[in-house]
Amino acid sequence: EGVIRSDSDELEGRFPTDGYANLSTSCLCCGGLRFAAKLAASLGDNDTAALYNSRAEALGEAIERYFGATLHGFETYRYSKGFDTLRAWICLPLCMGLTNRAGGTLDAMLSPYLWTEEGMRTCEKSAENTSDTIWDRSTLYGFKCAFLSGAGDRIMQPFLDYCHKRLVCDRVPYAVEAYPEGEKRHLSGESALFVRVVTEGLFGIRP
């Protein structure tokens, strides 16, 4: 069907999928192809750049066909077939330049289904998920996608609130892995992603 087959993602099975394909893996692959194309072009290898861009385009279309869905009235994406709950990773298509469902996705992200004072829930609370677990990784991708989509006016205050909590409040001065899981352990990967929110999201400086 054109998407990437994957039985899990970086959440390592903490939240359910169909074990066949998920939105995160396909979006990360799409983004990787786009950046690989830019690298090839910068090295003068235009044939390889064209090949990777073509593959990224085809994968983007497959993501739209396979994962595109209307959930709670929002035109956004399902995470995996058979799981019609909102997930934080709906922000990834926007980060990878897939903007067909930008408006509905931003509305869903900032809705009470996902947004909390700590960031985005990994999954909306439902029979499928009863936890309020947030991962800074997906929250930071959410900030980045909102800025890249021109929705800075909507996301700036939540971003400033997040900066206050993480940089000058109870757990400083880094982004955290997850909460309540892990009791807000610090991870370098999330902190590096925070920097990318500023350089790529706010300033538009992209590789």
Regions found by a protein language model. Give the residues of each.
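Active-site neighborhood of glycoside hydrolase catalytic domains
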Residues: 23-71
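Non-catalytic C-terminal accessory modules of carbohydrate-active enzymes
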Residues: 148-207
